[in-house]
Curated annotation (Swiss-Prot):
Xref: PANTHER family: UREASE ACCESSORY PROTEIN D (PTHR33643:SF1)
Species of origin: Rhodopseudomonas palustris (strain BisA53)
Subunit-structure text: UreD, UreF and UreG form a complex that acts as a GTP-hydrolysis-dependent molecular chaperone, activating the urease apoprotein by helping to assemble the nickel containing metallocenter of UreC. The UreE protein probably delivers the nickel.
Main localization (coarse): cytoplasm
GO molecular function: nickel cation binding
Stored HAMAP family: UreD
Keywords annotated in UniProt: Chaperone, Cytoplasm, Nickel insertion
Subcellular location: Cytoplasm
Protein name: Urease accessory protein UreD
Described purpose of this protein according to its UniProt entry: Required for maturation of urease via the functional incorporation of the urease nickel metallocenter.
Transmembrane helix is among the record's keywords: no
Top-level taxon of the source organism: Bacteria
Length: 286
């Protein structure tokens, strides 16, 4: 008796192109929500989360609301993309922070992208106070802030960027860091700035006009802001451990920081922010 022939099965092609394989391994995350004032208290109204980015809301204290972003990917690698879109409704009080310092890892070529959109309605106050962003050597990242502040609204936005892990004896020698900030008030562009550091970043940071050899920089943007506020912020000068410049123009104030490491820079920033009347997130105090 003849042995029956087995049906021919075509093997499944499981190979992926290099670009498709790379895309399949990239982290993507998005958080979008808005808050409204209800019975004198700020409450979350709408929330969307996707991918590796999540947000948690600690127990509210007083009339304000706090939100904490969590990157479940554990960091940002080359080609990852994250987006945040937050709207604070009229009369609300919202503080935003992160669960930990954000780490931007070494890239083999692709650039990571972070897009942050903030909208602050009349009578509202939004405080953007994440923990520092740490760039590893050969990291590549592009970050964009699009901020719309209504007349009569208040904004405090503070960012710290650290080039390398000083505690591990590491410094960022090369890579790419592009940081774009656009601030509009009442629909009118008030402030536009793009910071671009690429190539031999270590050598550029050594220049006196850039970081004077420091490994950490920071910026605090305050709306509204005037010379009276600047004078009050400058009272913290006796506590500074790095270099700090504070000025005001066009209805807002700005403080720029530079220090040898993140510890000194954070201390300087806390000394300044403490004079704005803002309550710093508890994670900043640990």
């Amino acid at each position: 008796m003849a042995t029956p022939r087995r049906p021919r099965v075509n093997p499944i092609d499981t190979t992926l192109s290099e670009s498709a394989l790379f895309a399949a391994n990239r982290a993507v995350g998005e958080v979008s929500f808005d808050v409204q004032r209800v019975d004198g208290v700020t409450r979350r109204n709408r929330l969307h989360e996707s991918g590796s980015l999540r947000v948690r809301f600690p127990s509210p204290e007083g009339e304000g609301l706090s939100a904490m972003f969590v990157n479940t990917a554990g960091g940002i690698a080359g080609g990852d993309r994250f987006a945040v879109d937050i709207a604070a409704g009229e009369g609300t009080r919202l503080t935003l922070t992160t669960a930990a310092a954000e780490k931007i890892y070494r890239s083999n070529g692709p650039t990571s992208r972070l897009d942050i959109a903030l909208k602050v309605a009349a009578g509202a106050a939004l405080h953007w106070l994440p923990q520092e962003t740490i760039l590893f050597d050969q990291a590549r990242v592009e970050r964009r802030f699009e901020i719309d502040v209504a007349e009569g609204a208040a904004l405090l936005l503070a960012e710290i960027v650290v080039f390398g892990r000083a505690a591990m004896g590491e410094r960022m020698l090369s890579g790419s860091f592009v940081d774009r900030w656009r601030l509009r008030r009442g629909g009118r562009l008030m402030f536009a700035e793009t910071v671009r550091l690429d190539g031999d970043i270590g050598q550029k940071l050594a220049r006196p006009a850039i970081a004077n050899g420091g490994a950490a920089i920071g910026t605090a943007l305050i709306v509204p802001g005037d010379e009276k506020l600047v004078e009050r912020l400058r009272e913290a000068a006796q506590h500074f451990r790095g270099e700090v410049g504070i000025s005001a123009w066009n209805g807002f104030a700005m403080a720029r920081f530079c220090a040898q490491d993140a510890v000194r820079l954070r201390a300087d920033m806390m000394a300044v922010l403490g004079r704005t009347g803002a309550a710093l997130p508890r994670l900043w105090l640990n």
